[in-house]
Amino acid sequence: MMASYPEPEDASGALLAPETGRAAKEPEAPAPPSPGKGGGGGAGAAPEKPDPAQKPPYSYVALIAMAIRESAEKRLTLSGIYQYIIAKFPFYEKNKKGWQNSIRHNLSLNECFIKVPREGGGERKGNYWTLDPACEDMFEKGNYRRRRRMKRPFRPPPAHFQPGKGLFGAGGAAGGCGVAGAGADGYGYLAPPKYLQSGFLNNSWPLPQPPSPMPYASCQMAAAAAAAAAAAAAAGPGSPGAAAVVKGLAGPAASYGPYSRVQSMALPPGVVNSYNGLGGPPAAPPPPPHPHSHPHAHHLHAAAAPPPAPPHHGAAAPPPGQLSPASPATAAPPAPAPTNAPGLQFACARQPELAMMHCSYWDHDSKTGALHSRLDL
């Protein structure tokens, strides 16, 4: 038997077949980098467009500084800053009220921004804003994401807190604190005992002054009225001294000025009248009510009655001021006017409330108890 062997041409064809397959697969190798051609290689050269839905990673100070630096005159108005931020970052097209309020706050409170008034007076509204030359390099190498810590220049404190002036002003030599002037011991609010010194009562402060001492004549009148009140209390209400007590009430009270309530604090406790707040003797304790039908000295008459005419047989009318025969015989003749009637009238005229109390006490016998309690007030 003869063995059959394949022809060498077939073997060479079989050997060349895998090589052709490899050659066909080799052009596919550079295919993977081709999809990334648009995203990776040209990313650094083409400028990035910010995403409108994403907030820019810059502070409001950086946005303001960016807008001012990129302007032609290195200064912008508030509306110009708004327009630059909206054109640069579309994110700020919405919610304008919130971030624009923050821009205004940063312009006013940050020391890096200086307000420059417009030329030509107030013809156009709005001022220019520019950067302080001392804050030109507050961002490192133009990187607005990193801000350097700036050392703020020393600014003197306000006028009312300058060294050498107290919190309340004039101090050292006077020993107190005023509103104007300078002290020698620095800030006044650091020295607690200072405002307790005597000089604190200054004319510029609307504080009440201590009451002035009473006049000597008022003290004498008050003492005399107190003695008269004690005597009237011992003698009783029907004595002539009762009218003198009412007259004495008006004496010290009339001598007081508009600050009589303050001055009465300096009187002894027994001299202060607790009813009307004015100085004067206290009202005597009321005696027990008693029935009486005789007239008193305070019942004043216009004129004294003439003496009665002698009786005669003719039917003559009685003279004026005399009782008629039909009157009861038990009626007592009117008493003459007391010697102190003008003083009583003067006292009642000066203090109507005292006159009301006095007359109501004597005229109405049934209300004596209630009026006595009124006098004790």
Swiss-Prot record:
The keyword Transcription applies. There is a cross-link at residue 25 (Glycyl lysine isopeptide (Lys-Gly) (interchain with G-Cter in SUMO)). Keywords: Differentiation, DNA-binding, Isopeptide bond, Nucleus, Phosphoprotein, Transcription, Transcription regulation, Ubl conjugation. Residues 305-322 have a biased composition (Pro residues). InterPro entries: FH_FOXL2, Fork_head_dom, FOX_domain-containing, TF_fork_head_CS_1, TF_fork_head_CS_2, WH-like_DNA-bd_sf, WH_DNA-bd_sf. SUPFAM superfamilies: Winged helix' DNA-binding domain. Gene3D superfamilies: Winged helix-like DNA-binding domain superfamily/Winged helix DNA-binding domain. It comes from the Eukaryota. It is found in: Nucleus. Residues 1-53, 277-338 are annotated as: Disordered. One of its GO terms (molecular function) is cysteine-type endopeptidase regulator activity involved in apoptotic process. It holds the Pfam family Forkhead. This is Forkhead box protein L2. The gene is FOXL2.
